[in-house]
């Protein structure tokens, strides 16, 4: 049976689509249809009929033809109170029939007397979301036409009688019902026609309009390659589009017939594959939610098995389907609503039979009533509010509302109102409007139920009216625009920078802070670290969502002033900052660039060298190098030449920066010539010759994009007075062809990261005089902008997991014949610069099957190509599990609060997610002193007294001098076991002379308690985590240590002089270590441990012992790197401690044995015997810094400590049970190369793992071993349920085989024994002389046997014998004898 969305592909209809059905077949199908109807009625027997009595009894026995439809709608409107309904027409069909719409919402007032058409609909109501339901788009699909009339009567009469649900609905919702979009087709259709085949040529059946056009293929389509469809043949579609454009519909349903399913966008795809291709929107989760809301309330649809004649085997999981996955529909209405309007529309197939007999109408109404009302109610989910002018307070119409991470914007209505449909989660929303500064609100929580309310107040770019000017008059629906004084550039004339002078460091710092303060909605000022002379290495980020990487948005950087005396790049980047900030929101080019790109501008990489340079310098090297006199552009690792000079702080900072962000394109701004220089910069021979990179064509293209906008550079003869013979065709050159530069930054970017970088020489004079600076801006401003635009060339997209649709981190994208792969970022997003052409691109990832696609790249922007990878071992795993129980891996949960928490963890894991949380913390701390043992004890008791419901204080044991080793648990149920919650411990003070860790843990404890129930993030973390804090492991040593003693070892050991970090062995000798081992580590119920120490600034991971294979190195290093990366300086890998100033620790992370090798360490014991990963954090170079440094140390470590609380909720959490559902505790979970954890009470286990694919083996006594694979995400936990089968094996073999073999063996043994017995019996009855022994009484016989056993010849002779024959004489003789 053909569905209502469109005609099925021929393969779906088979012979029914090609030949008229013979009469006998029609009879069989009608009989089958009757049986199907009986099946449906049986399935619905338990459905309660609600509201049916509200309609007149006679309305279910006929269809509404011609004028009867309008009369029925008028009657429905009359069923409600005055001012509730408004009937109007949006236009006419081909044959002139009106396209009626009934509007239902409270407070409409009396209808206008002279209004007609769309004007008769009445005024819009501020803040009230608009919902439309459209029926009978295909004229022969008639159920929708009828049920919308019934719905109208139900809503109106229900409002009149005071039904609370319907009153609330119509008081808050603007509902529009269009029962028939194709009234002409309806009049041609025939009652009882279930749509089993075509009824004639186009235009003669009821499906199409009167001109033979399918209305659901006549809308503009985003994936169409031809001209947009003409609307002349489809006045119905033209009328609908006009109506949609005049309104801001939020939600819509398109009601069809021919199946029973809810379909959602997209309806087609670029490939237009007939079926089976899931075409996902950016709002796929929302659409699935809406479709499920309808289907779950429909008694047939929710089963997912409509059993429609002709498609009996067709099923839809949960009763929903993606449109294109079902079958491709080009030009459909639901996609048009989503792509070209604010409206989220789904398509609803209401019945198998398109035009069922009128006798079935009551049942169809009862089937769909609850679903229809529920769908309308869903317009109130997500986030709603108003966008207003901060000066006038008027609403801003058509302001854009964007959601970070979702590539689909909506716009505000006439009053500035918006309703953004979203599923539960945490979101960052941005409102922007031309002429206003954009505003972003972060961490907006959306919960199940009514929408979260959030208003935006936007500042105009011109903040006040000039004196003497006339203020603009504001009326509803308009935006106030103040009069602009003469000479002010218009929106088509970009504002040029005015600040042209040399900025020394203090001046540059003020400049950057000023623009960061004036334009907070598009800027973020941050530092990469410090130069040798401790000057900040500033970077200004410019983006419409500063501080956040938006998936799919490329990142770009400019670096200036790498050589301190080459200053033009420094000043141009300051000019560029001013230009971008002042023109955002008014200049289309700048606005589009900032909205689509995350831009990072570093004006000075060498601020120390700059301060030594001299204005007017053309050729000298004064100030070129950094303060350690190293050339920074010879200081990067090189592919051809070993760089022996020590890596400089500025170099380390930049390398850490570039590896932390997904940069796509970059330029390094220099001076001394006028040319764009591209990789490679050197070669193996070290001579000046062309050194081509694999992407030579790309580098030439992006280099030309800069040079051709600079006319002097493009000429190719830059410095005639200085270098007479130097010539660069078109102003570009290969680096090594010009001269060899080993250790250059641009080659390192290309070889070690995804970033393509070129070096741009901006002028022959390195440090020009100040009055020449405007000339440099004028020469380079277009080049700077055009070069940034190159970041949007080539190929972009996402690499996704086919199982759950999530992005795959670090997947590899390879281009055939170009030996330079790139990798994906956290959301699976990638960018690959390419010149126009056709390429074969392969996406691959560990644990997945690679996918290759042919891609054509054009010159007009990047082409988007997504890859969906299937996990490589899925089939093998499924095969291996047959007959042996099973395991399932899933990230889904039906618990709304769990979903909400998962969304929170994902948000906090995003870039700057934790920073936003810390800014929102309602309470923070001011550390000002150290705590002695007595103070520490009182502090902990005070926390327990003030927060008794979330804290529990216990002692693990006592030190040598009988001081308690306190343990504080923070949890929502601290005295109740919750094995399903992850457990994390923070420990400090193992060395008493390093008490900074102790103070940081006390601060962490207080921070969590203070913010509990005051900050939603802290509250959820505490509610879902068991946090154990042990602030002082060595209280005796702490009492002896002295403040401000940075190097002393006093207090390093315990009272027995033992370094406790060498005493964690199986025969621990000290009471402190025994207490920790027995009461903390050996409980084996922790998922993560963080130990704080002092003496440097880095993180170490196991093992500390010198010779030890690190089985789970990837995970341990991942955890250590996570702490370091959230620390402002640790990740730079340069502690700069006085006793080791040249120390370089890549990423701030090192294996313990490489840092300080020793045996008996706490973290080694924790990993080996506690099965818990532990990292050691060294918080400061000074063991015992002054108390005045504590606030700074808390600020540095706070984010890292909190990141551990977030991280403990990732990895894999699972449940192990048997087939009966009984949890199995103490099962062994073996991961990858042998890491072991044990299931807790209730069968729960949790283990942290680095992102990627991991193998899991589960072992339990009496059960068969289970194996599965799980994919771990970087921002969420993966769940796995392992179900065991009872182990019926004996000696490793199946029980049945062992029993069979054993039975056969026993039978053989018994048979053999019998045969031997028989043979022996025969032999024993023979005697050599023909006599045998007389038979005696039983007792005598036993005695004789015993005598025989002696083997005595004498006894043998005393026994009588008889021959083998038993004659009568012998018997007589025997009896007488």
From Swiss-Prot:
Domain Peptidase M14, by residue range, is 62-379, 501-791, 929-1208
Details of cofactor binding: Binds 2 Zn(2+) ions per subunit.
Gene Ontology MF terms: metallocarboxypeptidase activity; zinc ion binding
Q: Where is the active site?
A: 349 (proton donor/acceptor), 761 (proton donor/acceptor)
Q: Spell out which residues lie on the membrane's Cytoplasmic side.
A: 1318-1377
Q: Biological process (GO) annotations?
A: proteolysis
Q: Which Pfam families match?
A: CarboxypepD_reg, Peptidase_M14
Q: Where is this motif: Cell attachment site?
A: 161-163
According to the lineage, what is the superkingdom?
Eukaryota
Q: Which residues carry this modification: Phosphothreonine?
A: 1365, 1367
Tell me the membrane topology, using the record's own terms. Answer: Single-pass type I membrane protein
Q: Which residues carry this modification: Phosphoserine?
A: 269, 1355, 1358
User: What family, per the record?
Assistant: Belongs to the peptidase M14 family.
User: Know the name of this protein?
Assistant: Carboxypeptidase D
Q: Which organism encodes this protein?
A: Mus musculus (Mouse)
Q: What is the lineage of its organism?
A: Eukaryota, Metazoa, Chordata, Craniata, Vertebrata
Q: Which gene encodes it?
A: Cpd
């Amino acid at each position: 049976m053909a569905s209502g969305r469109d005609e099925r592909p021929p393969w779906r209809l088979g012979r029914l689509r090609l030949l008229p059905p013979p009469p006998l077949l029609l009879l069989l199908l009608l009989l089958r249809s009757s049986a199907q109807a009986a099946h449906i009625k049986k399935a619905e027997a338990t459905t309660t009929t609600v509201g049916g009595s509200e309609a007149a009894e006679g309305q279910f026995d006929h269809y509404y033809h011609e004028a009867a439809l309008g009369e029925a709608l008028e009657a429905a409107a009359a069923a409600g109170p005055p001012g509730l309904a408004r009937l109007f027409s949006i236009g006419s069909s081909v044959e002139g029939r009106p396209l009626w719409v009934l509007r239902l919402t409270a407070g409409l007032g009396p209808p206008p007397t002279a209004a007609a058409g769309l004007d008769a609909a009445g005024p819009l109501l501020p803040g009230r979301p608009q919902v439309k339901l459209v029926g009978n788009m295909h004229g022969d699909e008639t159920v929708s036409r009828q049920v919308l009339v019934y719905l109208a009567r139900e809503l109106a009469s229900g409002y009149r009688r005071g039904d609370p649900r319907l009153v609330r609905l119509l008081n808050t919702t603007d509902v529009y019902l269009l029962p028939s979009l194709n009234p002409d087709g309806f009049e041609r259709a025939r009652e009882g026609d279930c749509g089993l085949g075509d009824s004639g040529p186009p235009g003669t059946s009821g499906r199409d309009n009167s001109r033979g056009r399918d209305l659901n293929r006549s809308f503009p389509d985003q994936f169409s390659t031809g001209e947009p469809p003409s609307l002349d043949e489809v006045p119905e579609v033209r009328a609908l589009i006009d109506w949609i454009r005049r309104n801001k519909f939020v939600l819509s349903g398109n009601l069809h017939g021919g199946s029973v399913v809810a379909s959602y966008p997209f309806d087609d795809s670029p490939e237009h594959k007939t079926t089976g291709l899931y075409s996902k929107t950016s709002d796929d989760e929302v659409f699935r939610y809406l479709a499920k809301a309808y289907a779950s309330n429909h008694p047939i649809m929710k089963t997912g098995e409509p059993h429609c004649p002709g498609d009996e085997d067709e099923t839809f999981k949960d009763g929903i389907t993606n449109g294109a996955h079902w079958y491709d529909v080009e030009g459909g209405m639901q996609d048009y609503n989503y792509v070209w309007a604010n409206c989220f529309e789904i398509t609803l197939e209401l019945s198998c039979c398109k035009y069922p007999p009128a006798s079935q109408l009551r049942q169809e109404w009862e089937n769909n009533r609850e679903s229809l009302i529920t769908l309308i109610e869903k317009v109130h989910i997500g986030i709603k509010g108003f966008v207003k002018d901060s000066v006038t307070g008027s609403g801003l119409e058509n302001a854009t509302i964007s959601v970070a991470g979702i590539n689909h914007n909506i716009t505000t209505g006439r009053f500035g109102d918006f309703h953004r449909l979203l599923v539960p989660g945490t979101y960052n929303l941005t409102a922007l409007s031309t002429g206003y500064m954009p505003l972003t609100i972060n961490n907006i929580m959306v919960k199940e139920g009514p929408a979260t309310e959030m208003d935006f107040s936007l500042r105009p770019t011109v903040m006040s009216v000039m004196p003497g000017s006339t203020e603009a008059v504001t009326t509803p629906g308009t935006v106030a625009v103040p009069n602009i004084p003469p000479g002010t550039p218009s929106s088509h004339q970009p504002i040029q920078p005015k600040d042209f002078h040399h900025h020394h460091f203090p001046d540059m710092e003020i400049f950057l802070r000023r623009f960061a303060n004036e334009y907070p909605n598009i800027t973020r000022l941050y530092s990469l670290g410090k130069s040798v002379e401790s000057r900040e290495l500033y970077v200004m980020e410019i983006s419409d969502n500063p501080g956040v990487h938006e998936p799919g948005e490329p990142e770009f950087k400019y670096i200036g002033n790498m050589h301190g005396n080459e200053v033009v790049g420094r000043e141009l980047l300051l000019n560029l900052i001013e230009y971008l900030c002042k023109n955002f929101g008014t200049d289309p080019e700048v606005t589009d660039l900032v909205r689509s790109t995350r831009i990072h501008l570093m004006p000075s990489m060498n601020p120390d060298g700059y301060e030594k340079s001299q204005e007017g310098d053309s050729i000298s090297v004064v100030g070129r190098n950094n303060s350690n006199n190293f050339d920074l552009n010879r200081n990067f690792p090189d592919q051809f030449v070993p760089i022996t000079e020590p890596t400089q702080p500025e170099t380390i900072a930049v390398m850490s920066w570039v590896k932390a962000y997904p940069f796509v394109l970059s330029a390094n701004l220099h001076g001394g010539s006028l040319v764009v220089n591209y990789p490679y910069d050197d070669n193996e021979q070290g001579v000046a010759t062309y050194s081509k990179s694999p992407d030579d064509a790309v580098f030439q293209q992006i280099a030309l994009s800069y040079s051709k906008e600079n006319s002097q550079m493009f000429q190719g003869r830059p410095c005639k007075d200085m270098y007479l013979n130097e010539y660069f065709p078109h102003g570009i050159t290969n680096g090594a062809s010009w001269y060899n530069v080993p250790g250059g930054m641009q080659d390192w970017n290309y070889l070690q990261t995804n970033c393509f970088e070129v070096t741009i020489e901006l002028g022959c004079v390195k440090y020009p005089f100040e009055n020449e600076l405007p000339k440099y801006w004028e020469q380079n401003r277009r080049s700077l902008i055009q070069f940034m635009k190159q970041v949007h060339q080539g190929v972009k997209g996402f690499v996704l997991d086919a199982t759950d649709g999530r992005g795959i981190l670090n997947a590899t994208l390879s281009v055939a014949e170009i030996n330079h792969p790139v990798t994906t970022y956290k959301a699976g997003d990638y960018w690959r610069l390419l010149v126009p052409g056709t390429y074969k691109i392969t996406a691959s990832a560990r644990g997945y099957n690679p996918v290759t696609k042919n891609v054509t790249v054009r010159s007009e922007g990047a082409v988007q190509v997504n890859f969906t990878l299937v996990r490589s071992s899925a089939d093998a795993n499924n095969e291996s599990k047959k007959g042996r129980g099973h395991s399932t891996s899933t990230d889904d949960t039906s618990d709304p609060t769990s979903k909400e928490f998962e969304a929170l963890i994902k948000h906090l894991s995003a870039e700057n997610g934790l920073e936003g949380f810390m800014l929102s913390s309602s309470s923070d701390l001011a550390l000002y002193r150290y705590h002695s043992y007595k103070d520490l004890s009182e502090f902990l008791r005070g926390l327990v007294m003030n927060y008794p419901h979330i804290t529990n204080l216990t002692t693990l044991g006592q030190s040598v001098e009988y001081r308690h080793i306190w343990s504080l648990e923070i949890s929502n149920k601290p005295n109740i076991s919750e094995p399903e919650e992850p457990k994390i411990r923070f420990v400090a003070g193992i060395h008493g002379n390093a008490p900074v860790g102790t103070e940081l843990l006390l601060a962490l404890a207080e921070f969590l308690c203070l913010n509990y129930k005051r900050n939603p993030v802290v509250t959820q973390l505490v509610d879902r985590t068991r946090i154990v804090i042990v602030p002082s492991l060595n209280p005796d040593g702490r009492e002896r240590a002295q403040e401000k003693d940075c190097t002393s070892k006093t207090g390093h050991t315990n009272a027995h002089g033992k370094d406790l970090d060498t005493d964690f062995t199986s025969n621990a000798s000290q009471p402190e270590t025994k207490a920790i081992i027995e009461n903390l580590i050996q409980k084996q119920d922790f998922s993560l441990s963080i130990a704080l120490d002092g003496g440097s600034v880095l993180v170490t991971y196991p093992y500390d012992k010198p010779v030890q294979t690190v089985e789970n190195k990837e995970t341990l290093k991942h955890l250590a790197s996570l702490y370091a990366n959230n620390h402002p300086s640790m990740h730079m890998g340069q502690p700069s401690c006085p006793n080791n100033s040249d120390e370089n620790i890549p990423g701030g992370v090192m294996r313990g044995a490489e840092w300080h090798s020793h045996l008996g360490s706490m973290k080694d014991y924790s990993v080996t015997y506690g099965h818990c990963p532990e990292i050691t954090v060294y918080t400061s170079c000074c063991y015992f810094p002054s108390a005045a440094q504590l606030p700074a140390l808390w600020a540095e470590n706070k984010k890292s400590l909190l990141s551990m609380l977030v991280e403990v909720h990732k990895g894999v959490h699972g449940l192990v049970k048997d087939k009966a559902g009984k949890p199995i505790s103490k099962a062994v979970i073996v991961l990858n190369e042998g890491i072991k954890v044990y299931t807790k009470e209730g069968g729960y286990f949790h283990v942290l793992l680095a992102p990627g694919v991991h193998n899991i083996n589960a072992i339990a006594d009496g059960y068969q071993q289970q194996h599965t694979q799980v994919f771990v995400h970087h921002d969420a936990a993966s769940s796995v349920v392992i179900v065991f089968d009872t182990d019926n094996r004996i000696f490793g073999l199946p029980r049945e085989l062992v029993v069979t073999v054993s039975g056969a063996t026993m039978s053989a043994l018994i048979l053999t024994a019998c045969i031997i017995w028989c043979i022996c019996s025969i032999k024993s009855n023979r005697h050599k002389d023909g006599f045998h022994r007389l038979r005696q009484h039983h007792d005598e016989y036993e005695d004789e046997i015993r005598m025989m056993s002696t083997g005595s010849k004498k006894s043998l002779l005393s026994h009588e014998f008889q021959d083998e024959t038993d004659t009568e004489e012998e018997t007589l003789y025997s009896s007488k004898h």
